[in-house]
C-alpha cells in the first residue's frame, strides 16, 4: 500500500510528557502567539489599508496561510501538553489534512512570489504590458484549491473508511501528488531565486537592489532554513522509512519548532526591511510595510520625496 499523507506527529509522541516534548511545544506556543499577532496586523494592513498589486495579493494569502498554520500548531501543542486527544481517527486525519494543505499552500505562495518577481525582472515589457490583470487572484485561488482537493481525496479514499475500502489506485495517485508537488514547488522556488540572484550580480543589465527584492530574498532564506526541514519529515521520511528512531524524533520536534519560527518570521522581516536606515519616530506600521514592499531603487532624492509624501495626510 502507498504511504499515507498523515505526518509522524501523532505516531511518535510518547505517552507521558518528558522534557523532549515539553520544551519544543512550549516554544511552539510562544512563537505561535507572536506569529499570530504579527500576521493579524499584516493581514489587516494589506487587506484594508494598502492598494493591492500582484505581490501584495500573494503576501496577503501567505499571511493567511501562516496564521492558520500557526493556529493549528498552537492547538496541537496545547493538546499534547494537556494530554487531550481527538476522539477518533477521522478527526486526526482531518487535522493532518489541514496542516498539510496549509504547509503546501505557504510553500506555493512563496514560490509564486519568487516566480512573479523573476518574471518582472527578466521580462519587464511583457510583465507590464501583456500580463493578464487578475493572474495573481486566479493563481491564489488555484493554490488554495488544488492541495485541498487532493488531500481530501486522499483522506477519503485511503483513511476514513478503513483498509477494507481503500482504493489503491486513488491512494497511489494522490500520495504521489502529495509527495512530488512540494518537491516541484521547491525546485521552482530555487530556480527563480537563483535567476534573480544571477540577474542581480551577473546580468548584462544589472538589476539594482530594491527593498522588495531584499524582502523576498530574506523570506526565501528563512523558509529554506526553518520551513524546509518539516517538509522533509512529512513528505519524504515516511516514504523512505516508516520507523522513527529517537534521533529522528528529536530532529522532528526541532523541525516543528523551526517551522513555527518560519511562519512568524515574515512580519518581522517586513518590519526590519521597511525600517532599515529609516527613522521610526514618525513612521506608522503602514508606512513601514509600504517601505518594505517598495520596488524602486533608493536614491537620496527619491528617499526625501518618499518621506515627504508619506508625511502628508
From Swiss-Prot:
SUPFAM superfamilies: Family A G protein-coupled receptor-like. Keywords: Cell membrane, G-protein coupled receptor, Glycoprotein, Membrane, Receptor, Transducer, Transmembrane, Transmembrane helix. GO terms for molecular function: neuropeptide receptor activity. One of its GO terms (cellular component) is plasma membrane. It comes from the Eukaryota. InterPro entries: GPCR_Rhodpsn (IPR000276), GPCR_Rhodpsn_7TM (IPR017452), MRGPCRA (IPR026233), MRGPCRFAMILY (IPR026234). PROSITE patterns: G_PROTEIN_RECEP_F1_1, G_PROTEIN_RECEP_F1_2. The keyword Iron-sulfur does not apply. Residues 1-25, 76-93, 159-182, 241-255 are extracellular. Glycans are attached at residues 10, 76. CDD domains: 7tmA_MrgprA. The keyword Membrane applies. Residues 47-54, 115-137, 204-219, 277-313 are cytoplasmic. Gene3D superfamilies: Rhodopsin 7-helix transmembrane proteins. The chain crosses the membrane at residues 26-46, 55-75, 94-114, 138-158, 183-203, 220-240, 256-276. It is a multi-pass membrane protein. Expressed in a subset of sensory neurons that includes nociceptors. Expressed in the subclass of non-peptidergic sensory neurons that are IB4(+) and VR1(-). It is found in: Cell membrane. Belongs to the G-protein coupled receptor 1 family. Mas subfamily. Orphan receptor. May be a receptor for RFamide-family neuropeptides such as NPFF and NPAF, which are analgesic in vivo. May regulate nociceptor function and/or development, including the sensation or modulation of pain. This is Mas-related G-protein coupled receptor member A4. It comes from Mus musculus (Mouse).
